[in-house]
Amino acid sequence: MAKILPTDGIWIPESCSFPEDVMIDMMEGLFRDVPNLTHKEYLALADLQSRWMAKLANRQPESNPLPPKPKKRKKIAPKKQDQPVEEKGSEVDIYDVDDNEMVNNRIYIPRLRSAWRARYFNIMMRAFVIKRGLLNKHINWQILDKIMAAPDAEGQAELQAFVDKVVAGQEM
């Protein structure tokens, strides 16, 4: 005979009704098979059946309801970085101004490294520096690291000095 494995408290509904079915069959058999029952004995047998059924009902395991539905996962919104407040200034089309005219160029450096934060720098330079893309040719990671590690005012001063140095090198 195969060994019955423990159920760990998990009951099949049919297994819960099995003892009740056995009791009902046994009591029906007693009612049929015992001849000449008096009315008092018949009532006592019916009372016995109701008591046994009550005791059996107390000993029945709890039926296993369906497990609760899993809770919905909370979506954690990524933290937004505070963008510096943009200042409204006069904007001009760089190609409409003279090459030697000084213009204010707002340079945005995004957060390219984890230690950085997105920053804006307002740099004064001649229009030809922007038109020819001279800063793009001379800027490198060393300069960016130096500028982004410094506080706002100091970083702006360093970037302005770098731009002035590039412009001075191009004018000669």
Swiss-Prot record:
Biased composition range(s): Basic and acidic residues: 79-91
Highest rank taxon of the organism: Eukaryota
Basic residues composition-biased segments: 69-78
Phenotype of the disrupted gene, per the record: Viable and ovaries appear normal. However females are sterile. Phenotype likely results from transcriptional defects at piRNA clusters caused by loss of Pol II specifically at rhi-dependent piRNA clusters in the developing ovary, resulting in a severe reduction in steady-state piRNA precursor levels and derepression of transposable mRNA transcription.
Tissue specificity as recorded in UniProt: Specifically expressed in the ovaries.
Keyword check for Translocase: no
Gene Ontology molecular function terms on file: TBP-class protein binding
Region (Disordered), start-end ranges: 58-91
Annotated keywords: Activator, Nucleus, Transcription, Transcription regulation
GO biological process per UniProt: positive regulation of piRNA transcription; transcription by RNA polymerase II
Coiled coil: none
Paired cysteines (S-S): none
Annotated compartments: Nucleus
GO cellular component terms listed in the entry, alphabetical order: heterochromatin; transcription factor TFIIA complex
Function statement: Part of a rhi-dependent transcription machinery that enables the generation of piRNA precursors from heterochromatin while maintaining the suppression of transposon-encoded promoters and enhancers. Moonshiner/CG12721 recruits transcriptional machinery to heterochromatin to initiate the bidirectional transcription of piRNA clusters. Functions by forming a complex with transcription initiation factors TfIIA-S and Trf2, and interacting with del which is part of the RDC (rhi, del and cuff) complex that binds to repressive H3K9me3 marks in the chromatin.
Subunit structure: Forms a complex with TfIIA-S and Trf2.
Miscellaneous section: The name 'Moonshiner' derives from its activity in the transcriptional 'prohibition' of heterochromatin.
Official protein name in the record: Moonshiner
Species the sequence originates in: Drosophila melanogaster (Fruit fly)
